[in-house]
Structure formats: structure tokens, C-alpha cells
């Protein structure tokens, strides 16, 4: 073994990448370049990978090689869940965790002065995701180096102090002398609740000489068996059958909540809250704002009473600065604080994720400023916030930006270190591009649409305005072409339904203004038509054109038509770059005797698992986002049939959640809600 290979082996020995896939095309070179960059201490690198080129597999190999705790950041829950599922399959023997917002529904507290309307915070917490968040922090604090956390931008939002979280853990070992009641007291400090009847997550049951702990961050039950005041055994049990899974000599029990504090810190916090309350009330009174002063005094006084009696109150996160002991204006603790200093950060779809990271702080402060100004909250509420972008950057160590169209920021941060990955394992090429005049563009488009319909393929049409999208949809429907449109006025559930009906063949054409959204990488789409492509602007710049054209990149007949009367700089750059990639892809296919093959859309995480059991090594094909249930038949169902379907969907949803297939579960839930709404209407 060469020295370099030995070095990589020793560094990555904590990670075990399990896959029958083998790096192909650009992947081996990309893996090597990114790995060497990390090893050499390069601060930032960019992986420019086209749709379907296997970027996730490349990143998995880099993680294995460098052997560091890794945070993978995605810009939405759905894509984060997909990445989590893929990483879980690649690293089944390592700690792969999922950290996103645990709200199924969240209405933030707000006040609208123009109408004197106060909106109370309203939320619904997803218990399963709460468990997974705790599992992520527990894994990071355990000292393990083989931890991968896939997260949304929730990772920059405030949470408990990791030092406090770590201080509260209870270490147990066989032979340890500890009174059973002392153990129960310490578990209570960790916010575990005693329940000797039925045991749920975060609860403790006592029966004779055994203490059963339903860990807040695990699906397993921990059983502590005593012999007098000595721990005789520590076992992990199946919670349903109570069958032993594993025995331990020692075990660390972590808190049942990310926000945990002790009595002393609570009393100190209350004193500081009272001091700040007096100052703010005096401030309002001097300004003649008696209503605001009275409102603030009543609200905060009530909160203090609740904290004293129960240890918490509604909106306690607005007092987090006091409990953390932070100075005014300082950043909150967040998930990044749980990582060691040498962690690796991977930002997926960085052209979208980075701007999102920029925007979080401003939006949060705008709402909080109004609440403070009108006496609903103390100024300290503004310190319960997401990180500023500058704070986020300061906390990062080494980063890999991943995108098919990296923005100027990523390229500048990478100082020109852009690793290219344009060869697809399937041999598929970038779509060919044609430029046609705008005169009679609709008639020309109609001919192209008819050809696609004959081949049972789908079409995406991009217009400049919502009105144009609606008018074109109406026209196409009038000619007998099954057409739908998507724009900002179409809500999320309706958008998902339309996309699925496009895939199912209910629609042949989808018209939209901005079809850059993730989840539109549909193998059935062979044609992308961009109307008025020469109108320079946000949706017609080089990056947007490249992203839009890429929607046809998963089809063997992929083609893009730009309707324009002139060639703009953005069009020229897009055409030149696409042609360059196509030449490289064609050359690779010819050299390796590869015939482009149509992508089979992977429908579920279960399909991925089934695929991974094949024995013949092959190239990794990046899965397209999950397919939603086809709903065309729903209109023909009776009410009773719909109720039966809802019951079936609920059962499947619960099964999917147990298998950690959260994308599947969410889709099944949405379909269930849609059918329920139809019954009620």
C-alpha cells in the first residue's frame, strides 16, 4: 500500500462506506481532488456537479476518506431527508443523523401595528423529528468521530448550551454503587418523567429492581437492573417485545430535552429578567407609552411565575440569553457548537442554500423588533435568533459547496478551486440547445409538444409572467393538450399534486414562471421551452438558464428550445458551457463504449435499499426526488372508498416513518389530507 493510500486509510478508518457502486466518469478525480484539498487545509472548495452525476456518492467517498464529523446542509426538509436516506445507506455502521425543524406546523408570534393585530405563537411538534434532533446532539457529544448530520438551516437557530447539555449526562457502569432513588432523581434532572404504567419516549418506569428508561433520542429501551444499590446489568431492549438486543458494561444517558438548565441558573435568569423588565417599563413610561409598559409588565411577570412553578413558560426561548448567561447582542448556541473544531461542512445546492443563510437573520429581527417596540417582549427576545451569516462563516472550518450552478460567492470563497463533475454514470448528455425566433413561437412550440406527446414524453414551458403562464395554459387546453401551470400563487400541496399528475400522464405540459425549484428533475421531461429567452433579468441570467435547461437532463431525448430574436450574453454563456459539457460527455461515452440509458426514477428509499443488495458492482446513479402517489383515480372513488384509502395511507405513513423514510411519510400524509378535504367538501 502506498504512503498516500495508507494515510487515507488511517484517516478514514472510522467510516465504513458500504456500497456496490464504484466511482466512474469524473467521480474518481473529483473524490481525489476534494480529499486532497481537505487534507491540505484548503478552507473552501466547490464541487460543480451536473444533475444526475452522482454528487452525493462523491461526497460520501470524501467523508470516508477524511474521517471527520461532517455537517451536510440542505435548504429544505425534503431534500435533507433524501440526503439523510442516502447517507444512511452508504454508512449503515456509522452515526448518520437528521436535524431539521421539529415543527409540523409553526405560526410565529407576531404583531401588526397597522391593524393592531397580535398573533399568538402556534405550533405542532413532530415527536419523531424531535427524537432525531436529540440523537444528533447526543452522537456529537459522545466523542464519536464517525458522525454525519444532515440538516436544514435549523442548524443556525438557537438551542441549549452544549456544555450544560454535556454536564447533565448520567454515566452508568456495571458494578457502580448508586442508590436507585438517586438515579431517579438524576434522571428527573435530565427531564425524564416517571411513568410506571405505560412507557413513552422520555419516560422512566420502575419495577422492583429494574429501572426502564425510554431514551428520548433512541427507539430502544434501556434497562438498568440493580442488586441492592449496585448496578448488576445494563441492557438495550426492543421496546415492543422486551427482548435483549445488546448488553453494555457502561452507558451514557443524555438529557431528554435540548433546552436544559439547573435551579441556580434559573434563579440567576429570573433576577436578570426582573432587572431588565424594570428598565424597559421605565423606558416606556418616560416615552408616554403607558399601554406598552402595562402590557410588558403583565406578560413578563406571568412568565416569571410560570418559570418558578413549572420550570418553563410559553415562549421561554425568548429568555434564552438569560439562561445561557450570554451578554446582550451575542450569538446564541446552535448545532454548530456541538461539532469539534475540525468538522467538515458540505453545503448542498449552495446557490440556493447560501442566500437562504443570508436571509434568516434579517427576517427574524424584523418581526422581533416590532414585538419589542410595542411591549410584547423584552429586548432580550432579539437575541433568540438565527446566526448572522458572518457568524455562521466564522464558525465553519472547511467547507465544500455543491451545486450544478455555483454562485459568484462560492467561486470567490473557493479561490478558483472548482472541481468539475459533468459525466453521468448513465451516459446521458446535457440537453441540446436550439435558438428559434419568437415569431410564431407558440405555433412552433405546439408542433414540438405534439411530437413529445407521441413519444409519451413531457414538456416544461417557461414564461416571463404569471399572466402569460395562465394564458398559454388556457390556449393549450383549448387545443386539446392536457396542460397545467405552476407559479407563486399555487400552494405547496397543489404544486406537488400537479407535478405528480404530470409524471402520471394526466398532464402532458407544465407551464411556469420559475421552474428552478428542486424536485422538478423529472425523467419523463424531454423538452424545456423558454419563451422570451432574450429578456435579460433574474430568470434569464446564465445561472437560471442553466438550471432551467437542466430540467431535461434526465431524459435520453433531452432538448431545450430558447425562443429569442437575439443572443444575449447570458444565452451565449449558457450555450457555450452546455456545448462544452456535451463534447466532454460524448467523448467519454465514445472512449468507454457507453450508450446513454434512460434514468429509472427511484421512487422510495426502500427501492434504493433493494438496489444496493445487487451483487454486481456498478456506477452510482443519483436518484431523482421521490414520486408522489398518482391521484387521477381519486375523482372516481366513493366516500366510503376514500375513507378506506385514508386508513390504508395512514398505516403506510406510520410504517414509512418507522423505516425513517420521512419523505415517503410526508407524501402519504399529504395525500391522506387531500382525500380528507375532498370528503369534507
Please place each PLM-identified region on the residue numbering.
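ASCE RecA-like P-loop NTPase motor cores
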Residues: 5-601, 608
